[in-house]
């Protein structure tokens, strides 16, 4: 639960050996829905289960698509002069920028996400010092995942993307919304290949966000 009016359901998984044992999946889902009662609830569901989620009252918004690429053998990329690492003094502005691209203010989450040791965070600032983009990458069990990647335009998103992949070994994953054509251009330009997709759905109204700034969502599991 991010606020009193928005929450997100993720990690909705039951081990295969228990899937036909009792009503575990049903009870997990019911508990999540009861906990988030009164909220607009978001989720990224597997495409095969869309009709099941519709029966629970969820509305289809769009597909989020995971792309995979390899960059450790393609030379070094430079960091643009307008890109800087996380500075606590910028925290309020970062939270405000994030809110343009996410259905709820998520102050506590971002403070933890920004300070996680294995994450690398970069921010793009204009000549006046205003934040015009933000991107983070984290090491995973298999490779690295970028998320979020928000930017005012393609040029800024690309500069952040290139900064984030510097020195990263193994696969790099980026989860993009199909609603942003420029995000599709970015993954095509760097020869990333689609490997998975989900359906973004909401229990109530579909949030009005700055979709053209969303070049990569944070995670499938947390929104």
Q: Model segments located where?
A:
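Conserved active-site tyrosine of GNAT-family acetyltransferases
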Residues: 52-58, 187
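Short hydrophobic/aromatic-enriched beta-strand-loop microsegments
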Residues: 61-66, 193-197
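Intrinsically disordered, low-complexity, positively biased terminal segments
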Residues: 5, 15-21, 30-40, 85-223
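Short beta-strand-to-coil "C-cap" segments at the C-terminal boundary of structured domains/repeats
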Residues: 68-73, 203-206
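Glycine/small-residue-rich loop that forms an oxyanion/phosphate-binding "nest" at active or ligand-binding sites
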Residues: 25-46, 50, 62-71
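Conserved N-terminal entry element of GNAT/NAT acetyltransferase domains
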Residues: 70-88
